[in-house]
Amino acid sequence: MKDLTAKQRSVLIFIEEFIEKNGYPPSVREIARRFRITPRGAQLHLVALEKKGYIERKNGKPRAMRVTKSVKNRVPLIGEIRAGEKKEAIEYLEDYIEVPGSFLSSGYEHFLLRVKGESMIEEHICDGDLVLIRRQDWAQNGDIVAAMVEGEVTLKKFFQRGEMVELRPANKEMSPMFFRADRVKILGKVVGVFRKI
């Protein structure tokens, strides 16, 4: 089965959630209304989903479709993040990985990053782990975040005091980093850690 565009993925998730809630699939018009596109645009998304093997439809019958491959709990793995010195993140779509739905917050995008380094070992985040990030541009003190500073990304605990931000490692062998708040961009908060044994 071929990869989906972001919009096709969103349409497929909408179809799955609609079926869960109502017991039947949405109409073409309901899909069009939800995504603020024309019915023809919605129809083209359905054709693409069918060609890629994610849904099956019966010609000529409204609402006669079923999902053949779920993507609802599949999250993109988009590269590596350094848990050590801040480094340029390597961002590219490696794969989609299924995660338990209980880890996903409704209304938020999520992504996975592979951890490189040992600055977060006292929080049980180790080299090679996958961290599940809930995409958000804010954090509370003590949150573990993926943060960008001057184009480089790091995984640290976040603390803000006035105009200063501390990005603190969870490894007593390493020192915290301090920056003006306007130099730190929060990419998201860690909401899960996955490890192969």
Swiss-Prot record:
It catalyses: Hydrolysis of Ala-|-Gly bond in repressor LexA. The keyword Cell membrane does not apply. Coiled coil: none annotated. The record marks A83, G84 as: Cleavage. The active site is at S119 (for autocatalytic cleavage activity), K156 (for autocatalytic cleavage activity). It is an enzyme of class 3 (hydrolase). Its EC number is 3.4.21.88. GO terms for biological process: DNA repair; DNA replication; negative regulation of DNA-templated transcription; proteolysis; SOS response. GO terms for molecular function: DNA binding; serine-type endopeptidase activity. Pfam families: LexA_DNA_bind, Peptidase_S24. Residues 28-47 bind DNA. Keywords: Autocatalytic cleavage, DNA damage, DNA repair, DNA replication, DNA-binding, Hydrolase, Repressor, SOS response, Transcription, Transcription regulation. Homodimer. Represses a number of genes involved in the response to DNA damage (SOS response), including recA and lexA. In the presence of single-stranded DNA, RecA interacts with LexA causing an autocatalytic cleavage which disrupts the DNA-binding part of LexA, leading to derepression of the SOS regulon and eventually DNA repair. Belongs to the peptidase S24 family. No consensus sequence similar to the SOS-box from E.coli or from B.subtilis was found upstream of the lexA gene, suggesting the presence of another target sequence specific for the Thermotogales. This is LexA repressor. It comes from Thermotoga neapolitana. The lineage of its organism: Bacteria, Thermotogati, Thermotogota, Thermotogae, Thermotogales.
